[in-house]
């Protein structure tokens, strides 16, 4: 459910762009959706986690710059910056001795610390790759970027989740 919730502003961005072919209008819809979503999550849980705050700041800054300056490149940079912030956060917390990935999902999944370390490095590499892929697409194939953002990056994430699931399946306890 969280994955679908996280995709809400992306879906609305895509739908708006598909209907209007206007990146500025799509950025405005994504900005409003991001702020409303963050407000709702804050109201419901009385807090936002670190990456939700980062996502909110980035949509306000990059979406706002896109709208105010009338330049779609700002909104196109947002996913790259978000992916790289995520990679930096995970790597930094891991190197500082507190595994951010374990802190965020460790209650649901019990793994040895060495596996949490490997999983963190997998995520760091994947997030760096995703940032580079987004940058590559929007700088080389600007007209196709919206489709890549909706379908390409989502497919890559699902593929990564499957690979991660296969990797983790060897460590998860089997129920009798």
Swiss-Prot record:
UniProt GO cellular component terms: plasma membrane
Keyword Amino-acid biosynthesis recorded: no
Keywords: Cell inner membrane, Cell membrane, Membrane, Transmembrane, Transmembrane helix
Subcellular location as annotated: Cell inner membrane
Keyword set includes Cell membrane: yes
Matches recorded under InterPro entries: YciB
Main location: membrane
One Pfam assignment: IspA
Bilayer topology term: Multi-pass membrane protein
TM stretches of this protein: 23-43, 50-70, 74-94, 119-139, 150-170
Entries under PANTHER family matching the protein: INNER MEMBRANE-SPANNING PROTEIN YCIB, INTRACELLULAR SEPTATION PROTEIN A-RELATED
Stated role: Plays a role in cell envelope biogenesis, maintenance of cell envelope integrity and membrane homeostasis.
Similarity-based family: Belongs to the YciB family.
Protein name in UniProt: Inner membrane-spanning protein YciB
């Amino acid at each position: 459910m969280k994955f679908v919730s996280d995709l809400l502003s992306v879906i609305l961005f895509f739908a708006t762009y598909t209907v209007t072919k206007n990146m500025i209008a799509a950025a405005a819809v994504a900005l409003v959706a991001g702020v409303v979503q963050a407000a709702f999550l804050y109201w419901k849980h009385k807090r936002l986690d670190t990456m939700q705050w980062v996502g909110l700041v980035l949509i306000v800054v990059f979406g706002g710059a896109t709208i105010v300056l009338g330049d779609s490149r700002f909104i196109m940079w947002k996913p790259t910056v978000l992916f790289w912030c995520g990679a930096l956060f995970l790597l930094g917390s891991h190197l500082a001795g507190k595994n951010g990935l374990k802190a965020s999902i460790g209650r649901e999944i019990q793994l040895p610390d060495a596996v949490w370390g490997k999983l963190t490095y997998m995520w760091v590499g994947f997030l760096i790759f995703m940032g580079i892929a987004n940058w590559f697409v929007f700088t080389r194939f600007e007209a196709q970027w919206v489709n890549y953002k909706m379908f390409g990056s989502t497919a890559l994430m699902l593929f990564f989740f499957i690979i991660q699931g296969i990797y983790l399946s060897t460590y998860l306890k089997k129920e009798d």
